[in-house]
A protein has these predicted regions:
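Conserved "HGTGT" condensation-loop signature of ketosynthase/thiolase-family condensing enzymes
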Residues: 1-153, 193, 201-220
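Active-site-proximal alpha-helical scaffold in enzymes
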Residues: 83, 138-142, 146-149, 154-188
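A short local structural element in Rossmann-fold oxidoreductases
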Residues: 197
């Protein structure tokens, strides 16, 4: 197989937005973790929350995709010149020849969690402004990214827990090798939600202090 070129890459996390911020945090030993103060969660643990996600706005035409996961996606796409390289690839290969392969565990499940709080007390119906397909659904991540760039080709979301963002690279490489696409947007996005926080707490895997996953005396992951 012909070696593939990674022509652009970026990272956004609790360490910061973009490669420079991430590198600086790593070199200075700043973790980005803080005591949990997310939503209504009451857990004695530390979490990594990306700053300013809630301030990110999606284009009006993509309002149905509005959720924290897709807001973080846009933040990442518009960092380190990544979106510019995507648009260059589209100009070179065409809208149908650039694929989207993104991994996620929970996608926009927070929207469902919040919607359940607003169910109709009589019928139990979810609110009319809740859009499952374009927020909670795992594919919403890939569909949003495809729509964001006006792409018309292959798009795939892989949701296999922690391996999701590794498997997408293999999936994209296979499609390029088969000649079905010429370039691909590859990566992974996950945002905080109640399911993840309470889920790991129920498994007794959270820690009341900043996690030390490789420490012999660790008390959580």
């Amino acid at each position: 197989m012909t070696p593939l070129l990674l022509s652009a890459f970026t990272a956004t996390s609790c360490l910061g937005r973009g490669l420079d911020a991430t590198r600086h945090a790593l070199l200075t030993g700043r973790s980005g973790l803080a005591p949990c103060a997310f939503e209504t969660v009451k857990l004695d643990t530390w979490i990594g929350e990306v700053a300013a996600v809630d301030d990110e706005e999606l284009p009006a035409a993509l309002a149905d995709y509005d959720c924290r996961n897709n807001r973080l996606t846009r933040m990442g796409l518009e960092t380190d010149g990544f979106a510019d390289r995507v648009r260059e690839a589209i100009a070179r290969y065409g809208k149908t020849r650039v694929g989207v392969f993104l991994g996620t565990s929970t996608a926009g499940i927070l929207e469902t969690e919040l919607a359940y709080r607003r169910r109709d007390p009589a019928s139990g119906a979810l609110p009319a402004d809740f859009h499952y397909r374009t927020t909670h659904n795992s594919f919403s991540l890939a569909e949003f990214t495809r729509a964001y760039f006006g792409l018309e080709g292959m798009a795939m979301a892989i949701s296999t827990a922690c391996s999701s963002s590794a498997k997408v690279f293999a999936a994209a490489a296979r499609q390029i090798e088969l000649g079905l696409i010429d370039a691909a947007i590859v990566g992974g996005v996950d945002t905080l939600c109640l399911t993840t926080l309470y889920g790991f707490a129920s498994l007794q895997l959270t820690s009341p202090q900043p996690c030390r996953p490789y420490d012999a005396a660790r008390d959580g992951i």
